[in-house]
Amino acid sequence: MGKDLTKQLDHVYERYLNGDVTRRDFLKYLGVAGAAAGLVGGPFGLLSRPAWAAKSIRFDGWGGSVSEAFREHAFKPFTDATGIKVIDGEFGDMDTYLTRVKASFPPGGEFNLAHLSGVFDYARYVGLGFSVVLDESKISNLKNVMRAMMEPYKAITKGTLSAVPYDFGQTGIGYNTKYISKEKAKKLGASLLWAKELDGKLGSWGDWRTNIWYAALHTGQHPNKIKDMDAVWNALREQREMVKKYWGSGAELMSLLANEEIYATVAWSGRVATLQAQGHPIGFLAPYNCYSWQECIFVLKGTDLDVAHKLLDFMLAPACAIAVAEGQGYPPSLDPTKVPIPESVKKLPAFDPTGKLEGYLFADPVYWNGHQLEWAEKWDRIKAGG
């Protein structure tokens, strides 16, 4: 009977992850099975007895609709299946969270999983000694994740992972289709942000990295291998005279575009998705080698890996990953050639139906971090009109 029940549990669990069984029916089945014989064996058996005894695991994220989706589609089913509570924390920004991690004792000890901002933070946490080596064989849903999203992490940790890629986006170009045609935007590419006819109607983010990236594209250079920095600085000085506003937040970006104070700007794909959903005539252009980024679920040193593997598997389940994508406006890390993706996600800016992310360029953290002090300081002077 025990073996039969285990097989049934495994089968129902697999169907739930594939989206064939509703969350309600899955939880109902867990309750019946748990009352009959307890949850043991199969994927549930991946959790050792000490792990089952662990009463909780902590997850820190961005809050809001993203955390709500995690709670409904991952944390609640996980707790019902294992008895382990997920402590759901929130943070406002990456630097503040890292300070808290450093201040914990032992460093990182009270923190387990975190929804980090991709490759830069991944490299930073690895460099500080907070990384682990995940056993990929214990995260079955990892097989559905785009390889193109895993490779930047594995390049940092020599072929291993201390995190799983979770979602991605692009800092492309948002433009008002009432004044700029799709054909013109596509023809000009990154150089749209230097179009003379848009003088006084251009915007940009105040971030040094984004502006240098687009100046590199405008001058025909690879952003991770810039050869002529003088050309980049000259392009930014030229653009500075045409920029009406350097925005500092997503809300300000949306306001400038929605109120037609500017007609074109570098823009976060998720914010453009929100503007489009609100009915504003805003297009999104992702030029080749568009500044692309991703977010990951990072596992910190000292975390019970048996528990972490199982929780990550729940979070990568299509039902959960897609719900989070719909909540935050950024596509999931799931490979569309392996997992059915609903239209609500397919229409998001930055979505790639091929799963290959060709033309999506991720910043080389070693290269950019190595130039940060010099380039950020010079950019600040140019932005100020110097």
Where in this protein do the model-derived segments appear?
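Periplasmic-binding protein-like
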Residues: 233-239, 247, 276-301
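Early extracytoplasmic/lumenal segment of secretory-pathway proteins
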Residues: 54-123
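Mature extracytoplasmic/periplasmic domains
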Residues: 52-53, 295, 300-363
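N-terminal secretory signal peptides
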Residues: 1-25
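Extracytoplasmic ligand-binding site segments that recognize negatively charged/polar headgroups
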Residues: 64-71, 94-95, 115-258
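A ligand-binding cleft/hinge motif common to bilobed small-molecule-binding domains
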Residues: 121-124, 258, 264-281
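C-terminal segment of N-terminal export signals and the immediately downstream linker at the start
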Residues: 20, 42-63
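N-terminal export signals
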Residues: 19, 25-48
